[in-house]
């Protein structure tokens, strides 16, 4: 889970750089959203490609959760959040930023990070509790 949180944090940082680029393009081209990505910056390519790593590591966590019968329902909820996050990102790029997609993308990125952190803390608590019981 620590690796997933670390990757998500990097992805959020890359996303803020993409957002900065979009804001600069919005100032240049105003509301002509079709021109915002005429020249795709390298940081966007990193952000888009790195999302594959983020989804993959979280999918692996779901796989482990199910295979080991850990019963952590929050890991499955995390995949739903990731799916919505990816869909909103794809919609922003291919459909010229439909209304609300930026907000959804930002809010769900925060939710994903929060749920991952909650799962991590919960795992530490379970481990501590099981160690206390064994002593």
Can you say where each PLM-predicted feature lies in the sequence?
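Polytopic transmembrane helical bundles with strong interfacial aromatic enrichment
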Residues: 1-135
């Amino acid at each position: 889970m620590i690796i997933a949180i670390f990757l998500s944090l990097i992805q959020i940082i890359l996303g803020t750089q993409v957002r900065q680029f979009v804001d600069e393009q919005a100032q240049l081209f105003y509301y002509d959203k079709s021109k915002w990505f005429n020249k795709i910056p390298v940081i966007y390519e990193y952000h888009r490609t790195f999302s594959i790593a983020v989804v993959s590591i979280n999918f692996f966590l779901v796989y482990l959760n199910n295979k080991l019968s850990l019963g952590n329902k929050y890991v499955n909820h995390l995949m739903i959040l990731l799916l919505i996050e990816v869909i909103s990102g794809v919609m922003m790029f291919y459909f010229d930023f439909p209304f609300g997609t930026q907000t959804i993308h930002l809010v769900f990125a925060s939710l994903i990070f929060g749920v991952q952190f909650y799962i991590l803390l919960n795992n530490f608590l379970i481990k501590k509790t099981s160690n206390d019981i064994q002593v």
